[in-house]
Regions:
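Acidic/polar residues at beta-strand termini and the immediately following turn/coil
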Residues: 16, 58, 118, 139, ...
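Aromatic-rich beta-strand edge motifs centered on tyrosine
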Residues: 1, 10-20, 31-41, 52-62, ...
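A motif-centric feature for acidic-aromatic and gly/ser/thr-rich catalytic loops and repeats
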Residues: 103, 157-173, 284, 289-355
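Short secondary-structure boundary/hinge segments and terminal tails
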Residues: 94, 124, 244, 340-341
Length: 355
């Protein structure tokens, strides 16, 4: 694909002899370039000739080192090829490096993640049943402890380990979860969730003929979503009481990956991923208006690709969080007003609804 016309403008792409994408020019005129070495593996990403990251690889072409501003991230693998350690450190050449974060991972013989060790948030242990379903998680981060049980069809049940079984927490009729730990759900004839009621209030959902969610109504207001022909969300809007949209956020896509978002306050964020085929974020480049300078922010991710910290080019933390098992955050913090909405790979948090 050489050219892609989207609701937010035209993207153009260039490729080398091995069909590796070497450049993408975005509608705002900025160009992201990928440099490869002889075997066709990624060596550098730059934006308008400004280096975003450089990569060093081992004899198997696995990434073992990347630059992220004044920080560098080193990766180590176990004999099975699984990531066992990801250490981020600061330090100039000739200076003893200082560890910024250190993440270590342990696995079972069935490739189940058993333990993570995070230098800033402590240890987290995971427990599974014989079929590989997670049954409990214990973390030193905010003392998080949770457990789960399942029915014979694999549906999550509302009761926790050791909790007395009742009709409400032991049965999932027609494989539709009607209630789960204080949250109640209602469905339409297509099996789509049309209402969710919990301690934080009630949300109602409306869909189009393609089963895409196009509107959410909460106690705080109504929000509307616009899609393109490929089902990619191109815009979200807050709807005023008189039915008019405002506070529009627009989304630009590169294939099925979110490439850029433009927020109502005039700031755009360009997302850069660890390689052309990945959904794991590497960096975000913020820009105010057309003439504003680029501000590069770097993602530091867990083994599953979920962002745990963001740093600026000087290596200072601007955002951080931990995660519960299903993706809810633990003690999210922003330092300096940076909002970060990427979660698990391919997921984007709408803060106005919590979805």
């Amino acid at each position: 694909m050489l050219t892609e016309e989207t609701a937010q403008g035209v993207l153009t792409h260039q490729y080398d002899e091995l069909s590796n994408r070497t450049a993408t020019t975005f509608p705002d005129g900025r160009t992201q370039r990928h440099l490869y070495y002889g075997s066709g593996h990624l060596q550098q990403i730059n934006l308008d000739r400004e280096v975003i990251s450089e990569f060093t690889r081992d004899a198997l072409h696995r990434e073992v080192l990347r630059s992220q501003g004044r920080l560098s991230t080193r990766q180590l693998y176990d004999p099975a090829g699984r990531l066992k350690r990801r250490e981020t450190y600061s330090g100039m050449r000739g200076v003893v490096p200082e560890t910024f974060t250190d993440r270590q991972y342990s696995y079972s013989g069935e490739d189940e993640l058993l333990k993570t060790r995070h230098s800033r948030r402590g240890e987290t242990d995971y427990f599974y049943d014989p079929t590989g379903r997670i049954t409990a998680c214990r973390s030193e981060d905010e003392g998080y402890l949770a457990s789960w049980q399942y029915d014979a069809a694999g549906n999550l049940l509302g009761r926790r380990a050791g909790e007395r079984a009742t009709a409400e927490n032991s049965v999932v009729p027609f494989n539709r979860l009607m209630s789960y730990r204080g949250v109640h759900y209602r469905y339409d004839e297509f099996g789509r969730t049309v209402e969710k009621e919990g301690r934080s209030g009630t949300q109602s959902y409306r869909y189009d003929a393609e089963h895409r969610m196009v509107e959410v109504t909460t106690a705080r207001g109504t929000y509307r979503y616009v899609y393109d022909a490929l089902g990619r969300r191109t815009e979200k809007q807050h709807i005023s009481p008189d039915g008019k949209p405002y506070n529009r956020t627009k989304f630009l896509w590169d294939g099925m990956r979110l490439a850029q978002e433009s927020r109502p306050e005039g700031i755009s964020s360009l997302y850069i991923y660890r390689d052309p085929g990945s959904y794991e974020p590497l960096a975000r480049v913020d820009k105010a208006g057309k003439e504003g300078p680029n501000r590069i922010l770097y993602f530091h991710t867990d083994v599953n690709g979920a962002p745990e910290e963001m740093t600026d080019s000087d290596g200072k933390i601007v955002w951080e969080t931990g995660y519960q098992v299903w993706g809810n955050t633990i003690q999210e913090k922003d330092h300096g007003g940076v909002e970060q909405n990427l979660r698990y790979q391919g997921q984007y948090l709408d803060r106005e609804t919590g979805l």
